[in-house]
């Protein structure tokens, strides 16, 4: 959530910055809500002052033995008016909060302006695209003999699911373990095991709710008893779309000791996404699934360190690609292609030979204080006043897409897969992965 004071100070400037994100700020609605809020607060203060005056007058009259009935009647009416005003103010503040919840983050000044992904800025290219002297296969054809099975997954669950068996399941597990170990041992992250289902407050904290509910898998749970309408009481849980949600929420409603910052967490979880807006896209293979594994990096920092932390976190994700010997490029997203809560984002795109294209394998973002304000996540130095933290997150990496890139880039003429040296210890020293 952006700072409401920015809207109150210079709403035109905020409107202009949001327009670069293709977001049209409803200035009229905010001004209407804000005008009523100010009016109610002013009226409440006036009534409070009047009530205080009447209380003194009533006390003086009673002290003198005089009749204070008129003043008491007026004070009673003021109490009624104040209760009514407080009720309306509470509703109004909730409406303002809902309005603010729907506004995306403001882009950092270093982010290039642009309408969509065609105007993103390539900032780095690493590695050489492999040259093959045989007709290459895509990961679906390569993966079949290695244990990749979409047919049985469709029978069990439907489209956009996969079953991994045998050699390819082992490779998938090895990739995740390699990523976790590298980040925990060499990059200084604390490993976290977190819930795969979270409550609505956690989803609101990181920005998935209310805007992106259709992209989530909701799991209602009956709590027992009935609500006021006679319906069974239920509580909604959500399957996590990314470990960013539970891990970032570790600091929700907390005041962190400044001396402990930065906090650096890594988690390996399955991720669940409905892909509501992706009909017809990437229908073949593992690129876009309802369930996929990801190793997620999260950093919690002081405001003055967040941009430096973004470079560091992105570098940690890049290191995984380099150790896996996978060609990639690093792209700075323009304002029109950024995620809802991001103030600055780098995408890492890995080379996929069968598509003759780079495909996203990691997105690394600084959220500034956007999530922290929603979560009331703060830090405190000494006897100072609590301040909002800055939060960052990134994939380090998406395991399924790493698997796709690895078997396609490292394929051999006989259908076996050359294993990068860094990954060999996780596969018992295997140099090549062969079909059963």
UniProtKB/Swiss-Prot annotation:
This enzyme's EC code(s): 6.1.1.11
GO molecular function per UniProt: ATP binding; serine-tRNA ligase activity
InterPro entries the record matches: aa-tRNA-synt_IIb, aa-tRNA-synth_II, aa-tRNA-synth_II/BPL/LPL, Ser-tRNA-ligase_type_1, Ser-tRNA-synth_1_N, SerRS_1_N_sf, SerRS_core, tRNA-bd_arm
Subcellular location: Cytoplasm
Nucleotide-binding in keyword set: yes
Coiled coil: none
Binding positions for L-serine per the UniProt entry: 242-244, 296, 395
Binding-site list for ATP: 273-275, 360-363
Pathway: Aminoacyl-tRNA biosynthesis; selenocysteinyl-tRNA(Sec) biosynthesis; L-seryl-tRNA(Sec) from L-serine and tRNA(Sec): step 1/1
Domain of life: Bacteria
Reaction catalyzed: tRNA(Ser) + L-serine + ATP = L-seryl-tRNA(Ser) + AMP + diphosphate + H(+); tRNA(Sec) + L-serine + ATP = L-seryl-tRNA(Sec) + AMP + diphosphate + H(+)
GO cellular component: cytoplasm
GO biological process: selenocysteine biosynthetic process; seryl-tRNA aminoacylation
Signal peptide annotation: none
Principal EC category: ligase
PROSITE patterns: AA_TRNA_LIGASE_II (PS50862)
Keywords associated with the record: Aminoacyl-tRNA synthetase, ATP-binding, Cytoplasm, Ligase, Nucleotide-binding, Protein biosynthesis
Primary localization class, coarse: cytoplasm
Family: Belongs to the class-II aminoacyl-tRNA synthetase family. Type-1 seryl-tRNA synthetase subfamily.
Biological role: Catalyzes the attachment of serine to tRNA(Ser). Is also able to aminoacylate tRNA(Sec) with serine, to form the misacylated tRNA L-seryl-tRNA(Sec), which will be further converted into selenocysteinyl-tRNA(Sec).
Domain comment (free text): Consists of two distinct domains, a catalytic core and a N-terminal extension that is involved in tRNA binding.
Subunit structure, interactors included: Homodimer. The tRNA molecule binds across the dimer.
Record's protein name: Serine--tRNA ligase
Species annotation: Polynucleobacter asymbioticus (strain DSM 18221 / CIP 109841 / QLW-P1DMWA-1) (Polynucleobacter necessarius subsp. asymbioticus)
């Amino acid at each position: 959530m952006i700072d409401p004071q920015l809207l109150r100070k210079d709403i035109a400037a905020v409107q202009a910055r949001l327009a670069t994100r293709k977001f049209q700020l409803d200035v009229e609605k905010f001004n209407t809500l804000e005008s009523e809020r100010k009016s109610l607060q002013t009226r409440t203060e006036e009534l409070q002052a009047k009530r205080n005056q009447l209380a003194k007058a009533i006390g003086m009259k009673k002290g003198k033995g005089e009749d204070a009935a008129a003043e008491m009647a007026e004070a009673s009416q003021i109490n009624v008016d104040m209760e009514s005003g407080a009720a309306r103010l509470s509703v109004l503040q909730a409406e303002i909060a809902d309005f603010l919840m729907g506004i995306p983050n403001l882009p950092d000044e270093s982010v290039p302006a642009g309408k969509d992904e065609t105007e993103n800025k390539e900032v780095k290219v690493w590695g050489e695209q492999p040259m093959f002297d045989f007709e290459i296969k895509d990961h679906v054809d390569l993966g079949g003999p290695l244990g990749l099975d979409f047919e049985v997954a469709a029978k069990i669950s439907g489209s956009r699911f996969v079953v991994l068996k045998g050699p390819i399941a082992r490779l998938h597990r090895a990739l995740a373990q390699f990523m976790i170990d590298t980040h925990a041992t060499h990059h200084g992250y604390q490993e976290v095991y977190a819930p795969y289902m979270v409550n609505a407050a956690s989803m609101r904290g990181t920005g998935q709710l209310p805007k992106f509910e259709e992209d989530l898998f909701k799991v209602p749970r009956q709590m027992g008893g009935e609500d006021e309408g006679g319906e069974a009481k239920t509580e909604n849980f959500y399957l996590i779309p990314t470990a960013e949600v539970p891990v970032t929420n570790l600091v929700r409603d907390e005041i962190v000791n400044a001396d402990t910052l930065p906090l650096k967490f890594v988690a390996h979880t399955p991720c669940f996404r409905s892909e509501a807006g992706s009909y017809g896209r990437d229908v073949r293979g593992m690129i876009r699934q309802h369930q996929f594994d990801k190793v997620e990096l999260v950093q919690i920092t002081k405001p003055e360190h967040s941009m430096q932390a973004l470079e560091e976190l992105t570098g940690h994700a890049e290191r995984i690609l380099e150790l896996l010997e996978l060609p990639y490029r690093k792209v700075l997203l323009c304002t029109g292609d950024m995620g809802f809560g991001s103030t600055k984002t780098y995408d890492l795109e890995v080379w996929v030979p069968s598509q003759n294209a780079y495909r996203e394998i990691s997105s690394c973002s600084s959220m500034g204080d956007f999530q922290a304000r929603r979560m009331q996540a703060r830090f405190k130095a000494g006897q100072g006043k609590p301040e909002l933290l800055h939060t960052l997150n990134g994939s380090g990496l998406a395991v399924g897409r790493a698997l796709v890139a690895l078997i396609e880039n490292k394929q051999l003429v006989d259908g076996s897969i050359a294993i990068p040296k860094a990954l060999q210890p996780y596969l018992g020293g295997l140099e090549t992965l062969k079909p059963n």
